[in-house]
Amino acid sequence: MNSPADYDPKPRRASVAVDVGGVIVGGGAPVVVQSMTNTDTADIDATVRQVAALFQAGSEMVRITVDRDESAAAVPKIRERLLRLGMDVPLIGDFHYIGHKLLADHPACAEALAKYRINPGNVGFKDKKDKQFGEIVEMAIRYDKPVRIGVNWGSLDQELLTTLMDRNKEQGFPLSARQVTREAIVQSALISAELAEEIGLPRNRIILSAKVSQVQDLIAVYSMLSERSNHALHLGLTEAGMGSKGIVASSAAMGYVLQHGIGDTIRVSLTPEPNGDRTREVQVAQELLQVMGFRQFIPVVAACPGCGRTTSTVFQELAQNIQNDIRKNMPIWREKYPGVEALNVAVMGCIVNGPGESKHADIGISLPGTGESPAAPVFIDGEKALTLRGPNIAADFEALVIDYIEKRFGQKDAAE
């Protein structure tokens, strides 16, 4: 019979720590949230605005496309503008096809970036592949930059895949085509990492990723990678899709591997709605890590889903208002109230679970359900503190939450 401890998250996989512009990835460090812009990098103003928005939303690293000379020339200017805004966010250069040439032709770009992303599937073809891969690695060594060797199933090394498919055929097809493709993805990452180390890039300068678009494939390839190397791993489900589908797919895939101790940095690759908010992917990544108990980014507002006992919408509106206020104020609160991200607030809709849930929160309210007395007990630190009545219950509770934050988390400032 298993013990209760057997159902806890698996210990974090031991991986080599990599310093990316001052942010540590792997080596037992907290799982890092990152994101990517969708602006034309050559448009400096637009890119600075989006990087700033992603950074303020909580992205700890931001990847930008470097696809041509104009983009490469813009990178140091983008970096300089961000620093003037007080945003020392590591910028990751996303290179495909001609990264070796762009880094050589634009040394200021090579210096400004905190990390280079290399795709082994399109860094070069046939006899040029290893040569051009090596040139990027040599640039990373010259400028003391880490690289992410990012394999993607959509641009997988076809020579390697063909070799493995042929071998599988010779052996009588013991593996399905899907299983062979997974093996090719893993081998592409490991072979490339081995080549980078042979050239002279140390392991503490290498991060691996193996992006796929199906949940089961992600679970498989990262499980395989984790067993066969100790490189820091970047998790992400590529082409996850839009809206709830993308959120569910990314959460299901990454949640499983994170629970098994695998993963050192994550990106949730959501397709935004037209003119949608790019920062949504950062919020989802943070929420995934927070609900799994791996990190704390923002106070939690627990609220019941509602039922026939809660025909009023007051508790829903109150929970939403508090959550919105928290998100709006977190950039200030994070500095003013250290530790506030650990706060738990409960907004419950009736007597069934309301008092119990509110007692478990730092501060909670149990609003009256249908037919209940129009009174709302408030619990603070597990004890009933007072009862709110009248038409201003919501506003009164919001004021109590602010007062609680100031008293509990503002003490450190007051003592200094």
Swiss-Prot record:
Spans traversing the lipid bilayer: none
UniProt catalytic activity: (2E)-4-hydroxy-3-methylbut-2-enyl diphosphate + oxidized [flavodoxin] + H2O + 2 H(+) = 2-C-methyl-D-erythritol 2,4-cyclic diphosphate + reduced [flavodoxin]
Pfam families referenced in this protein's UniProt entry, alphabetically: GcpE (PF04551)
EC number(s) given by UniProt: 1.17.7.3
Pathway entry: Isoprenoid biosynthesis; isopentenyl diphosphate biosynthesis via DXP pathway; isopentenyl diphosphate from 1-deoxy-D-xylulose 5-phosphate: step 5/6
EC class of the enzyme, as a word: oxidoreductase
Keywords, comma-separated and alphabetical: 4Fe-4S, Iron, Iron-sulfur, Isoprene biosynthesis, Metal-binding, Oxidoreductase
Cofactor note: Binds 1 [4Fe-4S] cluster.
Names of the cofactor(s): [4Fe-4S] cluster
GO BP, one annotated term: isopentenyl diphosphate biosynthetic process, methylerythritol 4-phosphate pathway
Record: residues binding [4Fe-4S] cluster: C304, C307, C350, E357
GO terms assigned for molecular function: 4 iron, 4 sulfur cluster binding; 4-hydroxy-3-methylbut-2-en-1-yl diphosphate synthase activity (ferredoxin); 4-hydroxy-3-methylbut-2-enyl-diphosphate synthase activity (flavodoxin); iron ion binding
Protein family membership: Belongs to the IspG family.
HAMAP family with a match to the protein in the record: IspG
PANTHER family: 4-HYDROXY-3-METHYLBUT-2-EN-1-YL DIPHOSPHATE SYNTHASE, 4-HYDROXY-3-METHYLBUT-2-EN-1-YL DIPHOSPHATE SYNTHASE (FERREDOXIN), CHLOROPLASTIC
Task performed by this protein: Converts 2C-methyl-D-erythritol 2,4-cyclodiphosphate (ME-2,4cPP) into 1-hydroxy-2-methyl-2-(E)-butenyl 4-diphosphate.
Name assigned to this protein: 4-hydroxy-3-methylbut-2-en-1-yl diphosphate synthase (flavodoxin)
Organism, as annotated: Agrobacterium fabrum (strain C58 / ATCC 33970)
Organism lineage string: Bacteria, Pseudomonadati, Pseudomonadota, Alphaproteobacteria, Hyphomicrobiales
